[in-house]
């Protein structure tokens, strides 16, 4: 609704003349339409055009805003100026129109009606309001009103008046009262020194007449910086000079009232719209220090810390946008001085997380350089450091002190050393146990190997072999030497059984290569020597051992040396025969157990490779165990003959899968692994449980072959099954997923003797 400017002047003049008369508060529940019909309020059109947002405003010098919120006014071509001397409004050109940017409350216009309302635009109050205020009910809620010119004069004269002498809150209606209650004090930007005469920036205007007795709730440090009015350049004539009057806005806050009560008292305030100038620098960034001293805001702790505006209002084209901006950040802090100082500190201080990350990226710990003792590692580290410094120069600069030790350590005595791993105690024990009885040249603890020349060591082994042979010299057929038991047999009738075994009539010839005399083949010679020694020892008084007929060394035409071992024919390996019945299977098993028990009891013997190929059976059903290269026994001189568990002979069967099925192949290496776990890689130790492992292997394989060819309905088959179950309970060699179970507690079978006692 657009009103002519003369009506506005008339209403304001009448309100000024009657400003000293205190009228009773009006009913809060009177409808808003009632006052619209009576025209007892001032309301001007608010344009939605952006060009109209720059309306110029020159407000009254004494008009004050309460601590809840401040809205700025717009002004058209003519501006209304009110003098401070006589408290009267100055009239400008009658053709000009003034536009206000929000509905205000009713002016104090004289009327014959009984109820009147105080306007938010009231410019002054007299001291009589204080008297009428004291005469009214003390229990009513007290509100702070806007300060008039006299209140500003009171502030300038440092008069101490109680804050309880404010007028009651009056409103035009419930809707406006709720609206103004929600609005908080949030100025966009303080405009220090706007409209203040030169030389009087720090002094508020004084009254020429008597001072008002209305209590002032704020002192000099509670005044806020004035806001710069915006000018509507599109409608204002450029030739018309604009006269500016000092504009002061007092920021009032009560120490006793809470934040909610302070905000709720906004209904008795004077609301205006304003718009920040695009080309103007915010007040916080301007070097205007005297404005902060002149218009400090008082926080809840009465400190002189200036209140920093928390809501930067940008260009708003409508009241709804401005309303949302005001309400979006309407928050108060009970300790604004502490909070403001903390905010400044936090802005200047980096977070701990980012600081720690930056430090870790830029620095290298000195402890990481302790292991870089070799010269090559330091040079590599230096090159990497140089590359990283090219990528991030600041990083290299910050870490130069930390990395100085890495560059200086080049010239130290540690720079030419090579850092080697240090084994723990468990690894040391394993290495010592492995090397204690090792026959290799690298082992100094071995009794069979001494520090000597390699050729001398090879010749020593060859002499020992000849000493254990039946013929103590090397036979050379090229020179006419006759080979015993072989020259008498036609070689055309020989049958090759394996790669190094032939059957010549009733004689089994095993041919083992020893290499040439000049070659260092100590491993072959050593294995041949051990096998020959074991056979010599076992043939003295034990059954089930192959009978060695002759042994000698032959030098063939190619210059190679071969050890010939001639045995009696003891039958065929059980892997190549067809089993007849379960009784035969059970006899094979117990015969092997008896042979091993005799050797175990007298020689502390362990076969350690009792496969089906190493068990022979003749036409009479007699069982013979062969191939003792991998076995372990103790000589009468208490020497231990054994082969280390990591020797390739334990893995030879994997290369010849054609002779064994997949089940047998996998089961063999499960037993190998079980032995390594049981012996803890100490192959020289005597552990009779290894014989039980292989007997368990033999029983399982025979049971599988019997089930496939003979069926399961047999009493001897049940006996074999009970033995297998008993061995499983004691050996725990059954596995799932390739790993052995923990050994059970019921260990009633510890050797082959215990097994024979249970099933005698």
Curated annotation (Swiss-Prot):
Residues 78-95, 209-220, 237-250 have a biased composition (Polar residues). Periodically phosphorylated during the cell cycle with a phosphorylation peak during mitosis and hyperphosphorylated after DNA damage. Pfam families: Haspin_kinase. Residues 362-386 have a biased composition (Basic residues). The keyword DNA repair does not apply. The modification Phosphoserine is found at residues 76, 79. Residues 251-264, 398-408 have a biased composition (Low complexity). Gene3D superfamilies: Transferase(Phosphotransferase) domain 1. Residues 468-760 form the Protein kinase domain. The KEN and D (destructive) boxes are required for the cell cycle-controlled ALK1 degradation by the anaphase promoting complex (APC) pathway. Belongs to the protein kinase superfamily. Ser/Thr protein kinase family. Haspin subfamily. This is Serine/threonine-protein kinase Haspin homolog ALK1. It comes from Saccharomyces cerevisiae (strain ATCC 204508 / S288c) (Baker's yeast). The lineage of its organism: Eukaryota, Fungi, Dikarya, Ascomycota, Saccharomycotina.
